[in-house]
């Protein structure tokens, strides 16, 4: 299954901030950025992983205070996916949906989000993100849902996601599914399985781990 990421951004154009970054493209802004940078700095002395071993200090500081909010968000995602979390879990940890006072979520899903909240403080937008790493490509929204994010799935296994439906011309007869990604929601494709996941399917998958 193929995919296309298309994000429109208003950041002043410089090559070092060109999107997509290493694993993520981001439309919007991170209003909690200063707090997220401070929290990550506080966590850094405890960050360790066998993948990096003694070279873990080469990664620090994890977040560059001179980088854009989008570049900082990408760096946070990259840290998580390089240390054994896949993209759907990284999104659920870093940009979770609103969950604490919702009666429509299962206790198991709430427990998962409580775990995520214990690992890292949430990043709040408005933010729409698309990302790709390993077996997964994702497209998701922060819990505020104030940025447009739509998707199209075609009969030749192409997923297109971005801020506008008409960003790429697709014959209507080839579209088998289309819609919008709502506040806190996430859609994804697993390359290995060649499968498209809707938000409720990902929640079920992640909460069973």
List each model region and its residues.
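Short, small-residue-biased leader/transition segments that mark boundaries at the very start
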Residues: 1, 5-6
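Flexible, small-/acidic-enriched active-site or ligand-binding loops
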Residues: 14-21, 170-181
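Conserved catalytic micro-motifs used in adenylation/nucleotidyl-transfer and phosphoryl/amide-
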Residues: 14-30, 34, 121-161
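Catalytic or ion-translocation cores adjacent to nucleophile or general acid/base/metal-coordination motifs
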Residues: 31-79, 112-115, 130, 150-173
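Terminal amphipathic helices with adjacent charged low-complexity linkers/tails
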Residues: 33-52, 188, 193-209
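N-terminal leader/propeptide and maturation segments of large enzyme subunits in energy/redox metabolism
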Residues: 59-105
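A glycine-rich phosphate-binding loop feature that marks nucleotide/adenosyl-phosphate handling sites
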Residues: 92-100, 132-135, 202-205
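Phosphate-interacting basic helix/loop segments used at nucleotide- and nucleic-acid interfaces
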Residues: 107-127
